[in-house]
Amino acid sequence: MKLPVRLPVFFGIAPLGLLLGLADPRVSPPVRPSLNVHLPKLAFGSSGMLRVVTANPDERLNLPVSVEGVGPGEVLYRWLPLYGTRSVLPITEFPLASGIMAPSEPGIWRLRLRAGSIREEIKDLTVVVRVPFAAKQGGEINGYRIGRYGTEGRIRFDAYSPPMGFIEVTPGNEDMQLSEHLRLRQFVTKNQREIWPKYVALDLRLIDKLELVMQELNAMGIPARRMAVMSGFRTPDYNGPGEGGRATLSRHTYGDAADVWVDNDGNGYMDDLNGDGRVDANDAAVMRIAADRVEARYPELIGGNGVYASTPEHGPFIHIDVRGKRSRW
């Protein structure tokens, strides 16, 4: 008698998956080849916490990127737009050996390298290309009021020459990290809330210094996990002339000053940094000690430092800037 042919019956997900032509989950996927890219420490600031580099259009970047095991002439780079940055430029690759030039268009960009068929995006660092100062016409850029700088139209090369340009801020990029603990939206002028895009002058040395102050506080045994920014960049239009015209030279209008406090619990007020059970100007004075220590260690970040007491409108805070010379009040 001829016995019937019995087909094997498979039980379990894996064998059935193989019958259906699906990948076996027990087998690891192939490893994607990557480039061993090295970024210089200077790209992340003295704090090691910066996450962006700012540049003017077509500016040569001081960013000596190297790729281990690959000759410089074998690596090409191109720019990828981020956060809704619009580009009309053709997709072009450039030789890394010739140095890295910033994109020709303002916006937020990421660097991508390619060696043969292997591609690698540099995700640790974002390049922000400023809108040139010359784009400001009649005190505005795209309907956003900036105003006029007191030194505008004069030939100056000091800390009071107008900023080189402005970062364009949109609803899509305002939450971008500038550093480990600070975001772009924290430094936007507090008026014209309904107008987009907005524009911010920003000196990354300030961001680096604020991160270093947080590090110093932690080294002093004072927890500093979160920094609130009451005021960062202020447009000249918003800041006004002040008494006797003094505010026309405010460091806030140049993008290298901020009024800040440590706010670990996120309640909107300075924390009790000195542990005396009160929140007052003495806590801001603790931050001054940390800022003084940072300046002693990093003289290139020297600047102003002012302690402010509480008012009915706000709690105590400290002003920190990187104007290039020591000033205290």
Task: Describe these PLM feature segments.
Residues M1-R6:
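Positively charged n-region of N-terminal signal peptides that target proteins for export
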Residues P8-G21:
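Hydrophobic membrane-insertion alpha-helices, especially the h-region
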Residues P25-Q137:
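Beta-strand-enriched, solvent-exposed domains that form extended recognition/catalytic surfaces
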Residues I118, N218-P223, P299-E300:
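Secondary-structure boundary elements
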Residues Q137-V169:
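Compositionally biased low-complexity segments at domain edges in trafficked proteins
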Residues P163-P223:
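Active-site acidic/histidine clusters and adjacent loop/turn architecture
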Residues K209-G244:
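Extended, low-complexity, intrinsically disordered C-terminal regulatory tails
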Residues T248-W329:
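Catalytic cores and adjacent binding grooves of peptidoglycan-active enzymes
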